[in-house]
Amino acid sequence: MSDNKSTGDSGKLLYCSFCGKSQHEVRKLIAGPSVYVCDECVELCNDIIREEIKEISPKQDQDKLPTPHELRAHLDDYVIGQEKAKKVLSVAVYNHYKRLKNAGPKDGVELGKSNILLIGPTGSGKTLLAETLARFLNVPFTMADATTLTEAGYVGEDVENIIQKLLQKCDYDVEKAQRGIVYIDEIDKISRKSDNPSITRDVSGEGVQQALLKLIEGTIAAVPPQGGRKHPQQEFLQVDTSKILFVCGGAFSGLEKVIEQRSHTGTGIGFGAQVKGEDDKATISDTLMQVEPEDLVKYGLIPEFIGRLPVLATLAELDDAALIQILSEPKNALTKQFAALFEMEDVELEFREDALKAIALKAKTRKTGARGLRSIVEGILLDIMYDLPSTDNVAKVVIDESVVKGESTPILIYENSESQAASAEQ
């Protein structure tokens, strides 16, 4: 019950029954049967309820851990090809979250952490694989670019900033962040320039590898709370990185030469050498499948860093057939995305088979893989997306090979004619 105190001339002054503040000290006072509650107390109650829900939800998520088969099936819906990499990732991710679910040593055996290293050319699906799994598991996901990282104390981004980004993704909920997935791209760019230790300081190469070691293996990272250094009086958040799954990826351009050099050692020189013909030469993707940890050391990664990434998966370069599939088959395929965009204008969008082949050929020529497909399609549809909102009675837009090659404009089919087709005019 609130104590209603008289203010004299102004009558009764109302007070919050919980905190005791008067109606003049708060923005809103909600009245009940002989009880009053202020807006500040309502907000406080909401915060308490939210915190309790957060504590319960991670346990519920753990009970619903998908099997490797289910993880693989979900990846198949969004990622074309890369079958071996999907299987490796599904098993590694399942084992990681199974380890978290059964925390503590099992019969005296402490389960190690299985971070992942993905090797594959640009646009082969490294980032997409990690991101798709994180979305399916409903865990926080963040990306970091290894080329922007430097050792602490130097100009650049500290490795601890990676954990801060992860915390930002889950509104600084430490428990949730500790179940997250971190993808570090361009990991090959921090390789040292030679496999001999350098006497000079390498703050963006070997130095970053050294800085990442503990973070990836598992340590208690001290991260500034929301607001960072602007509020130095606040305590730092303690994040246990041993529960975070780290996935590192890179193109590792030139690694195939290191592998070939190793595999050809001992085949003889001069007249005793085994000369390989054109038919014997393996593709770059086939060569990368034979990668060993010693090849990565020769490439420039330090042995300790490779040891923290025990799960290795190699992704093949996407061929024309795979690129065509990527354009049309996944749940979020580009053609489906743009078809949905055109549907908002009540217009049907059709890509003919020859158009898909021409788009795939363009991406192959640019050597951008699947990553370059969107920019190509955006360029093809730019003019028609500009004109369509101002054009009446268009029922369908058709894209064929000549449109992709820039030889003609998209075919427009109008509502008021069953078979009328006309080129889009500026």
From Swiss-Prot:
**Keywords on record:** ATP-binding, Chaperone, Metal-binding, Nucleotide-binding, Zinc
Identify the residues that bind ATP.
P121, T122, G123, S124, G125, K126, T127, L128
Pfam families tied to this protein: AAA_2, ClpB_D2-small, zf-C4_ClpX
Task: Return the SUPFAM superfamilies for the record.
Answer: Glucocorticoid receptor-like (DNA-binding domain) (SSF57716), P-loop containing nucleoside triphosphate hydrolases (SSF52540)
By its UniProt entry, which InterPro entries does this protein fall under?
AAA+_ATPase (IPR003593), ATP-dep_Clp_protease_ClpX (IPR050052), ATPase_AAA_core (IPR003959), Clp_ATPase_C (IPR019489), Clp_protease_ATP-bd_su_ClpX (IPR004487), ClpX_bact (IPR046425), P-loop_NTPase (IPR027417), Znf_CppX_C4 (IPR010603)
Q: Set out the biological process GO terms recorded for this chain's protein.
A: cell division; proteolysis involved in protein catabolic process
Provide the protein name. Answer: ATP-dependent Clp protease ATP-binding subunit ClpX
GO CC entries = HslUV protease complex
Q: Which family does it belong to?
A: Belongs to the ClpX chaperone family.
Q: Where is the ClpX-type ZB domain?
A: 4-57
Q: Which residues take part in binding Zn(2+)?
A: C16, C19, C38, C41
